[in-house]
């Protein structure tokens, strides 16, 4: 037998997703071909369990899911339900009718059989008790054996029927969960922009992870309890009255009186669960925002701000969670104390009022009836509680699915035509970002929101933040001629994005008509990339056409980039393209559209993030090239040098369209006001004209050189495409995301120790365990006291009356209640502290993790820790409490049985050995299945996150079905792992029930030879309790181990190295730095080499340069050359592998990251806007006054726009708010102006702004950042032409550096890289 040691096994969830889409698909599920006996004993799971004992279970070792559970077969059932608001009861009732009554009638039959057995089993016990009371002369061994077997069969049938009830209802719960999850995802793909503002990705994530799970929990057994338990209670009550007469009614009355209290407590549990979910939603939204914007948060040094925001929501969640658990504990106490009071009250009336004597058959038959009665009476309030807890979840799901449907029905309806001969038209079109012109308050309406802008989320409601009341586009007429190029231009916030969103149906059409071709490809300004290979991002679900694919790579200028990638076109792209430059993202985005071969292409700013040379190539060879030339093309751009090449031009200004050809528009006033950019470039053109060295011959040579480069690229196109023999090796070499670590074997003891320390201390924990043991010992003493009482009445030699025994019984109940309260208080405090500390540590660990951590771990994987794993930890109290409760009960019961019948210890040892072997066989596989299940959730979250961010792209390419299939496959994987894990539960459940029943039989058998009737009966009744508790014990122990595997996964992330851990901060040096460091702003790069990963080539190669105080530096180079890497190195987002960087003579590796990043200003290429007020987005720490904020907004030309908003700078905006890309960049620039740092880095800050606005901003920067050192990365020559010096970077090397006095010399230098950069920017302006 192989010993399983603690090892680490790595599973890539992306690989997991692929593997599970097709693994074992055609295999028949073992359940479907199992024999009757195998189905009864669940032996069809045994092959997997045995294999899992000797080997670590992998996904391929788990059989396929039965067809009946697969989501593609269950989701259509939900399509029959018409989702409406306030239909929370309607959805639950529909699932009853369509899932339970149609698909799972067997579960009801099995539960009814179980209820019948629960009524008959006390009669079997009564017959046995009557037999053991007989005189020895009246006893027969065979008759006694018959009664012992009778007791055995009652216990066995009851246990086995319960196991099958659990299994059938589990299947129902899984079907419901899978169907709802798939339905929610399908509706997510239909969310409009308005819908995305109503429901963030975090909210939808919570619907899937929490609310769908609540449905699964309820439809696992609870719905049957509500159906069968009332009938079962009535039958048992009748049997109780037959046994002890009306005295039983007194006990039942107390039980009934406890139900309203229990129901009240359950309602409180439901109330605080709802509040807890509310704050959980907000926490998840903030965490999603933090993860999505983590790079910019680090650049701004805002991690602490976001951590504090999240902790604020977590604190509120924990307060409500604590109250929920407190009421849950009170409910449990009421049930347990009332069960004791039920007995004492019944026997009090029976003896003192009815004047009858307590006998063994009366006492223990009544105990057995009350025990069987206790279960439905306990489960019924729990089922009601779960139903009450389910209703808020049902309401949330119904509201989402209803409102989503409403949103989609109100989306603009467009007329589609086949072919490319039809003009694209908007006729009298009026559009609004709010569906059906719904009003969304842009201010803070409630007092709650006034006090806390995190109690979100009110949104800005249009294309730009300029307009708050009117339609964004009103009564417009638009035409894009068929087969022609139409260019749309206009200043920031003019309505360009609204227009193209109106064309593709992504904005609400109030009136008018839109006509558009049948197939449309759309490229968003913010590229949508999925975590897959570069090839798959371009193909995007379409079959491979190699000839077209090669032409697309060439047309989109991707050949040079692919040559430098380790896996060529099979290089893995991280989420949101984290391992690509902005230009590379845009070109892959463009390549996807070009490959699709659509009738129409709508391109939103595809040229903004690339250098001029690449932009020219893209325009000439892609937009005007062979593959797209005869198609209808609509290009939104600020690159006005391309306007003369357009067949049709549309100018937008404040939502008003002016359109026509270039010749028709160039003399019009409105057009000229937009085209002021021409004047910005006169200086550059004059500079070129004044140098006669640029003659025609040299220009022809430049063009000839470019053509030669392009020809060389065509020749080498095959070198960047992996063939079938290279693909596996290339995919392995190009892998970005690391495999998700999966522990195997038992959860390490250190994890338990760590969890105990987070909760309190070892002394506290072991004291808590003792409270459980003592309270359960007191509970079993109730029965022992009844034995003494009955024994005295039987022998009639006692001197004490019934009042004495009743008084002491009440004393035992009082003591039991005290210890019960203490144990629940202790476990409540313990688990709450553990949950709080784990989340706090996880949050700080993720917040301060290195950038590389986010490069190699998907957002779905990280979100999984904060959603499902934290939810598991939050609810660990219930499992731990039950584990300690049943464990202590089993311990005390076994000890009592051994004391009564010492000889029973020998067969018990054999049963214990069998028990150990069975649970070991089960536990090995069960833990691995649970770990695989945990990992299998990550693809679900990742697909949801990806899809939410790329809804417009997915819809425009009509890829909804493919993404739904991906999601359904991932859901099936998750259900499949849970299904086999749960079926394994039932396998061990049957085995343990056999062990328990054997223990009952042994107790009964040995009791036949025991002269003490009272102790004999006590031993049998105690053994009967084992039939439930022994199985429950192992189940709760495994469940607790599984919960601890979530703790284990969280701990793995907590132990991740933090950013900057590898560097030695000189605290003395940092403490001596002036508060306003750096005071000069001098920068030195000394032989700097940067590698993104150790196994990759350097992205910066031995770069050295010095920058003086207050110097203005421009950095240029083609896309992917290393410009942004220079910025990342300065902020220590990536540590130098060689060399060093100094600021004001200080080695930046010797100071803390917080100090460094707080001292540098940044205006990033991709702006970051989070949910909150405009004020918070500009000044998150509340450092600046209103007047300072308004002055900064005035400098970036946003003051007038924001002053029109009802709440001004206190207007709440959202991550999905329809601020234009340019407006977001202006807000980022406002942050820099407010901060006024000595050192500022501008990374393509004007790339998505029109030239006129960019020119104004450049003037503003020059006027307001005069005493600072600035480094500016730009593709626009006018942005950096006034720099003191210009650095030219190519392929990670600094190839040129010169001051502004030598600019003309470099422009005229034939071999200068800078010349090519300028040439491609300025050539088209010569036509003006």
Curated annotation (Swiss-Prot):
Annotated spans, Disordered: 684-708
Predominant localisation class: membrane
Alphabetic keyword roster: ATP-binding, Membrane, Nucleotide-binding, Repeat, Transmembrane, Transmembrane helix, Transport
One GO-annotated biological process of the protein: transmembrane transport
CDD domains, A to Z: ABC_6TM_ABCC_D1, ABC_6TM_ABCC_D2, ABCC_MRP_domain1, ABCC_MRP_domain2
Membrane-related topology note: Multi-pass membrane protein
Binding site for ATP: 490-497, 1117-1124
Name under which the protein is recorded: ABC transporter C family member 7
Species whose genome carries this gene: Dictyostelium discoideum (Social amoeba)
Native organism taxonomy: Eukaryota, Amoebozoa, Evosea, Eumycetozoa, Dictyostelia
Gene that specifies this protein: abcC7
